[in-house]
Amino acid sequence: MRAVGIGKVLGVIGLIVFLWAAYLGYTLITLTPQIRAEWGYVDEKTIELDVTVYFGKPLPVSINIEEADLYWAGIKVGTLKDLKVGFLKDSARGVLVLKNKEIVEALKEHIRNGEQSNIEIQARGSIFGIPIMRGSFSKPLETDLLSYISNITIESSGDLIKTPAIEGMPSKWGKIDENGIEILSDVKLYNPNPVPLPLFGIKYYIDACGYRVAQGELIEKVVIPANGGGTAKIRTIVDTDILPKVIAEHIKKGERSEVTLKLTLAVKVLNREMEMPLPEIKKTVETNIIEQLNLALS
């Protein structure tokens, strides 16, 4: 009789396990998870993203994502730790910590690859304490960062001697190293004056969020003909050491930054050297990183 009783108990346990496994399989097959992120704590060293995963239904399993690493352009830029899914819970929360310095290094690699790279998440975890989960997810990323300066135009101004007009700044990436990112530009100039303008110097600055992020200089002297056009070649160096502060400030301001471009030409007019400050260009740069991230993860 005792053997029969034990058999019935084992049969009930087996039935429960079977039903649980069947429900778990059905749940996982029909699962439509949604991931939502929002900005958390931000400073010049780290950026925190509060991440919530909604499963749409209670999960009959206890899952612990021990660590999920975020890679950009092959460089680890952040880690999501201790994302736990409780038994029969329909959501889970965690914090993704991004390292600003590593983000800048990944940006350099992204540019080296022609502004093409992959964003990848590598995760490992356990179910009911058993470390059996391991997987990855990646999405391609393409940008066109130089378009922000390549299409810059500045009208001529002044009375007796007018400042040259800028009719574009086609640019390309140059040297990229630990000291910064180099941008090489061809400044298209038009001289509206009846006399030629020998150009022997350019002061070129880009400020963002109150920080000087880049400055440029003339590579070689050029003469802009009277009532004609010419091209001035300039080299701009982006200070990557300051970028973590700019990134943090941009996020703190709701992903909104004021960017100012200042350009002064050093020319010679009637054998007299003089500087010609051009009108400043101010632009508001807005991003929607969180929105794009949520769309990519949903």
List the predicted regions and their residue ranges.
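Extracellular/lumenal and peripheral-membrane lipid-interaction modules
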Residues: 2-298
